[in-house]
Amino acid sequence: MKYKKKIAIIMLMVNIVVTLYLLLLSYYNRLSNDDWTFWNALSEKGIWGFIGETYLTWQGRFSGFFLTSLDLLVYQCLGNLILPTLVLILAGTYANYLLLKFYFPNINKKLLIVISNFLFYISILGLLDFTTFYWVCASGYIKFVVLSEFLFYFVIKKSSNIVDYILIILLSLLIGGSAETFTPIILLLIFVRVCYCYFKSYAIFIECKKELLALCVVFIGFLFMVFAPGNAVRLSSFEHDFSFSGLLLCLTKAFAQYFIYQLPKIFYATLALFPGIFVGQTLGESSTLGFMKNISVKKVISISSLILFIVIILAVLPGSIAVYALLPLRSLSFLSFVLVAHFFFIGIFLGINNYKLTYYVPLCFIVFFLILGYRFYKEIPNCQPYVNSLSKREFKLQILNEQILYRGVSDTLVYIQPLPDFKYKDLNCIYLDYMESLIYPNREKKINFKYFPFLYDELSSDKNNFRNISYKKRLNLKFDIAIVSK
């Protein structure tokens, strides 16, 4: 009992500290880069006009653009992004809670809330690209994971009403148009669930009606996304090699790259072992689950790891086909949640078989709090100067704009100074620097990996860059702008 109580207290402490950390950062978060392009389109055309234009000319992820529009409207009303961040935290915690409560109904509800919040937080901290959580255009990758959890809950819950079916349709449609890397994984999971229900009910399809409904709607949304005219426009800018050897080589490289980026972040996912052990020990005390003690833990780890490997391959495969490379790390954000689920599942079986990992608990969480404390120390003090720099730049440009309007000058190019560099070297950056030196020892110009929790709202030295044009349009400037080249 002391062991379980210790884990519960530590998880609660983690939740409090991480909540403070995430909300403090959200207070300083601002729109950046593509956000302003979308902001301008949304202001001119409205939500549906914006989605229609991007669908026809850029990309088919209609539901992703819909969620982005909602966040931009909130920012337009409130002037900050605290509310979307808070809603995402609450939704992610509640989605975890619903699923855990369904599978583990005998565990105390308050403890399930603590565990649910903890699992969501370590999934966020373990993101391959943490800026995904705060970048409006990219945060949809996380939101769709949460929406998928809600979808699975409404599909698997025993009793259903008309509201549940409506929610299944809406959630399925949103997930169908989420991302080419993510939707196929959801389709596969729903299909597995359909097969399970089919054989469990002795081939009576009526027992699988919710699963079949979700499968059909997600698939329709997926087709609508994949065959969008805008996809052809975007893909035309990439080179492709559809030969088997070319795809295999690209897939191998993409998987190796993913592994390199994932390795330093896997620590956060391993923390899911401890709430898993907590749940497993509680289940082990139930006589009805005594048979699970006879299942080999090594066998469970092997099977779960094999499934994890297959999911990772399926995740990097679309990028290998579409752009012949590993997609941006933000598009693989859902793998952070998959890794947490993997270790949580293993932890349950460790707990059932009375593995406590007693000595690892304090060590792991001491390391965790040291890492988080360092992030607090390096990031929070720099957030205010970062925001001040953005405001100062904008204020100067607006003053200059008024002067140019007064003088009647046109076709002017104004050079502005780049933002101060508030990025810093964390352990992940040091690791990536080392890996680059091993893989590319003769590269003359090496990548200088540096980190900041937000995507920098930096412009280009080219006045025709889309970011410069969007920034100019947002401020209604009467002159072109460009960054002074370093």
Where are each of the predicted segments found?
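Transmembrane catalytic cores of multi-pass membrane glycosyltransferases
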Residues: 23-86, 135, 173, 180-331
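Transmembrane alpha-helical segments
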Residues: 91-103, 147-159, 174, 187-195, ...
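Intrinsically disordered, polar/acidic, low-complexity terminal segments
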Residues: 4-58, 68, 72-112, 207, ...
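Signature aromatic-anchored transmembrane alpha helix within multi-pass, membrane-resident enzymes
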Residues: 164-166, 215, 294-305, 350-376
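Membrane-interface micro-motifs in multi-pass membrane enzymes
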Residues: 34, 111-156, 179, 313-348
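Membrane-interface helix-boundary motifs at transmembrane edges
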Residues: 2-3, 100-111, 158-163, 198-209, ...
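Short hydrophobic alpha-helices at membrane interfaces in multi-pass membrane enzymes
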Residues: 154-174, 212-213
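Alpha-helical transmembrane segments
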Residues: 6-21, 113-120, 169-170, 213-220, ...
